[in-house]
Amino acid sequence: MTPPPASAWTRSKPPLLRFLDTCLNEFSAETSGAVADYIPELGNADPAYFGISLATLDGHVYEVGDSRVPFTIQSMSKPFVFALALDLLGAGRVESAIGVEPSGDPFNSIRLNSDNHPFNPMVNAGAIACTGLIYDSKGAEAFEQIRLALSRFAGRDLAVDEAVYSSESQTGDRNRAIGYLLKTNAVISDNVAAVLDVYFRQCAVLVTARDIAVMAATLANRGINPVTGEQVMSAYAISRTLSVMTSSGMYDYAGEWIYRIGIPAKSGVGGGILAALPARLGLGSYSPKLDKHGNSVRGIKVCEALSSHYDLHMLNRSDDARNAVIADYDIGKSPSRRVRRAQEREILAAHEQEVRIIELVGTLSLSAVDYVSRRLAGRPRPQFVIFDLHRVTSTTRAGARLVAEAFEELAALNVTVVLSGVRRASKEWNTLREWTAELKNVRDFYLLDTAIEWAEDQIVYRYGGSIDFHETTELAEQPLLEGLSADELAELGAICTIRTYQSGAKILTTGDPADALFFLRSGAVHVTLPDGVRLATLTAGMAFGEMALLEQTRSADVFADMAATAFEAPLKDFERFREQHPRASERIMRNLAQLLADRLIVANAKVDILTST
């Protein structure tokens, strides 16, 4: 079989982009429907236009077809203006004027509910009322507030199509009738003309399918624009907006839409459809021909295909909470990388179940945290529980609240909680600390190994051990030199020089010649790879740079954790010593093999934990 050329790799398309291409090609043949002409300027749209865009929550945007062709946002502005009103005015004010129930009527129905309020903010009556509330608050600045909000959702500055605005204003008598109905029932202020002028302008804002996809993804991302990273609206406003979109976003087709497609969506008579699947993606499409409900014919087909092909119906979700735990073990199965002395090892071996480590992955949701808390209670009570979160991608507020309640229970049982793998500047940390800030039994370390090392130290202290970093360990006590005679040790000592290092000093550098090995005399050092991964923490009595016996260049960096001293043995002198003392040489290499084997056993144990949980 002839392999494909190298250029084929660079020309290959991601699966989602290929899917959108397929939709574009297949549905371009769909010619049913008609361009909206009750607003004359909209009737000038080219019915052949067809563009699709999909934005992911990590900020990537796929585009096919006429995705950059501008068109007016029309009713797709409604969810964003509703969210703006909730944040600007508060839910109480907005909900006192606008309902949230489906109407079952066309979008431009001149009818109110039994309380003489609009049924919901997705029909024209509700949208005009929403704009009116903002006008009452901001006056002449109302439209600019709305335009800026829409621009923040899109991630770029949006303008108005003045021709469409003028056309809407000239033919907007039905909306004027709705406006005066709202005024009669005290839903909006006396200045109906000014409110409608703002409404006509907001509907005439120019967007593209790409803009709509990014705006939809911002809704799906709890109000955070995935392209710009800006928190555009509060999570509260977004969740309420998505709720109304789900029940009423597609007007009198809303029930059929949620039954068949199951993604919160909003359409506009300009030919656009936006669909926002929470925590997943945002979709924007543009095709001017509409069906009898005022929805883009091709746009609906794209949404149907996406939902069906990838099984995206929001009520058909699977989330097995058991998948939240990637590893669950104690320090007997996977201790820290600190090389311990015999006394410390004995204490830790006797109390290995006192430190429990649970490594988590994915989303800390309510169901995931509940499962973890029950799993934790299924084994004997430890003194320390370490939750490693570096694989956690998000934390829900419900999950964070349940975390806090679980931590409170652990505090009552005198269990110390240690968090690792989450930076204090991160969104996940802020979500967790919102609920756990008052708890006194919670500590945090960024590195899991540092967290385990700290917990091990506490166990050593609690059970009568000591860790004296200032204690000196002479050559005779070095494990790598175990078994050497007094004469051999004396001769080896003669070739060594005692080096002193300040805290933070870099002792060895990756890639440098391996021309010496070191025996740590006092203090502590840590060994890391160039990417920052910590391989080991060493205390007095441990060797480092010993791989010089096997390698010609350094394969890791070594830093002093505190003031430290070490015996430095130049490699050429050490090799001469080994040649002159073959028995000692054989003993040293046997000790080295044992040290390497011990490290391999620890590494294999961790691999076994991660693959068997």
Curated annotation (Swiss-Prot):
Residue ranges annotated for the STAS domain, each copy included: 345-457
Catalytic activity annotation: L-glutamine + H2O = L-glutamate + NH4(+)
Pfam families: cNMP_binding, Glutaminase, STAS
GO MF, one annotated term: glutaminase activity
Positions with a binding annotation for substrate: 75, 124, 168, 175, 199, 251, 269
Sequence positions that bind a nucleoside 3',5'-cyclic phosphate: 480-595
EC number: 3.5.1.2
Entry keyword set: Hydrolase
GO biological process: glutamate biosynthetic process; glutamine catabolic process
Hydrolase found in the keyword field: yes
Gene3D superfamilies, sorted: DD-peptidase/beta-lactamase superfamily, Jelly Rolls, STAS domain
Annotated region (Glutaminase), positions in chain: 33-315
Subunit structure: Homotetramer.
Protein family according to the UniProt entry: Belongs to the glutaminase family.
Protein name: Glutaminase 1
Species in which this protein is naturally found: Bradyrhizobium diazoefficiens (strain JCM 10833 / BCRC 13528 / IAM 13628 / NBRC 14792 / USDA 110)
Underlying gene: glsA1
